[in-house]
Amino acid sequence: SWKKGSRHKSIDIHLVEKTEANINKIKKENIKVSFYKKIPKKWEGDVIFFAVKPQDFKKVAKEINLNNVFYKNIVSIMAGITTSKIRSYLKTQTSVTRVMPNLAVEVNLGVNCIFHSSNSKNLFKKSINSLFGILGNNYEIKDEKLLESVTAISGSGPAYFFLFLNVFEKIAHDLGFSKKVARGLTYGTVEGALELVKMENNTRKLIGSVSSKKGTTEAALKILEKKNTGLYKIMKDAVYAAKKRANSLSKLN
């Protein structure tokens, strides 16, 4: 998406990737990328991107330091590793940008939360914001600590909605519909509801337009909105559990 949608058509992408399946997937996109199985010695670039598992970063940083890799700016897509820790492991004081995207970047509908360190230059910030803007909607965050909450909301968020769809579809099937019809009812309902939200932008009003006093929807909503066992309590517990885990990951690294 970057290569196809970016104004910077002349950018050179150099990628360290050990997994053959991932390399072949990128090659099928018919874009020019230079691949490496190991970090080259005295590698040079304007921007170095880190998209590795957080627990692997120490090892990667050590290899970069040993190979005297030169870069002007750092962009991290790793959860839980702060800008100060990134600088510490890489033994540098250069600017660091942290980005928390989510799965929907695969269809250019991602939610990208971006934090730039205080020494990031405006031109670079605009360039990175523009680059990630190709993949979806950007939200610039001034407080780095909020990135752990971002991970719990938009980072993990798609999985919550996938689970809801899965459960809703299963219940429809339990009620007697075929799997095909159950899926159609589920996906069609969600798709239509999302379009209505885009038009109205007031979920409480939309809920009121579906429900009526002593009706079927109200009966369901009474269960979903119970104070101590309803959807709000379940979702709050789930999101806070994800945030707690994100916080613990940041302390491990």
Language-model regions: role of each:
Residues 32-39, 139-141:
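Short acidic-hydrophobic, aromatic-tinged amphipathic segments that line or gate anion-handling sites
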Residues 23, 57, 96, 178-186, ...:
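Small-residue helix-packing motif on alpha-helices
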Residues 85-95, 111-149, 160-199, 245:
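Internal alpha-helical scaffold of NAD(P)-dependent oxidoreductase catalytic cores
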Residues 148-159, 207:
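A short glycine-threonine-serine/GTX helix/turn-capping micro-motif
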Residues 20-24, 29-30, 38-114:
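Rossmann-like NAD(P)(H) cofactor-binding subdomain of soluble oxidoreductases
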Residues 4-27:
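NAD(P)-binding Rossmann-fold cofactor-contacting core
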Residues 187, 191-253:
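NAD(P)-dependent Rossmann-like dehydrogenase/reductase catalytic/cofactor-binding core
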